[in-house]
Amino acid sequence: MKKIHFADLNIKHRGNPKQTLANVKRAVRMGYDAVVKVINIDIGNYSQVDIDNLQQPPNKKKKIQQKKEANEESSTETIIPDPFILNESELDISTFLQNGKSFRQFSRLTVTLDENSVHKFQHDARVKKYDIIAVRVPNEQLLLTLQRKGDFVDLVTLDGINSDVRDVSWLFKQKIVQSCVNVGIYFEITYSKALQGSERRRQFFSCARKLIEITRGGNGIILSSGADEPILLRAPYDVGNLSTLFGLPLMTGRKLISENAQNVLLRAQTRKTIKGAIHVTNFSTKTPIIPSATGQDCVQMFKQLSKIEEFRAEMNEMNQV
């Protein structure tokens, strides 16, 4: 993956393709790196079952019960939609191509988990369709569970948690939070709710400052918009400057939307491998993806791999099949 300059890992999709397209267009105009656009689908509470569509006349109670039971069994299969893929032909990416960049979009799923749903969610086949997995956690017990076996999670987000800092219990568990950071799980702060009224703004700053404090100066944190409309997006340098209000130096603040964001994307990509050691890609496509810690593109990586005799032999055998 090429080095990115600025990335917003939380541009929300609310079911309106035109609105999502407008959000991405604005992000592009504001200067976010062309390589990264993350479209987020937030499904709320994973374990919550919506049975509104099961209401029937009183004389069909048995049928209601049957449908309710079927819904409870299959709810985790139907609650997760397919990722939303933006039609790139509707975007003007000519400037990026002239600068030697390529447009890439990533899908993201955000969900609220609890102790009873984490196992089902981890093994839900539809989850694997998404590039980035972000979760909201209600308490430190679940956070500790993710620290031990959370290799399927990329982000723990404060997005959607509209509470005072005193009500987010895990924000006072520095050792647990730091242990999550040590295993590669990042924490996300979203600034859009700070633009939606004084109470939301107070909640945003209190939670953000506490998270900055317990992560020792923003280590393992990204800053995203969480925007579902263009007016809530801010330019990269404005977002970087915002971090100074948390008590961070300016350059450290900019890492929250650049270097740290890229680390999240690299972790997400290695989730498609076996412990990050083996990567499977389709070489029949025009742009096969080969992960690189040095920032080289796939063509350079393939040329280097082709210098290895064993690799060339394997490729020759595959071409003969």
Could you say what each language-model-derived stretch is?
Residues 138-142:
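Short, polar loop motifs at secondary-structure junctions
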Residues 82-127:
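N-terminal active-site wall of soluble small-molecule enzyme domains
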Residues 36, 110-113, 132-137, 156:
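Short, hydrophobic beta-strand segments that form beta-sheet elements in well-ordered domains
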Residues 118-125, 136-137, 147-150, 169:
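NAD-dependent ADP-ribosyltransferases
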Residues 1-37, 43-91, 128, 143-321:
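Charged catalytic cores and adjacent phosphate/nucleic-acid-binding surfaces used
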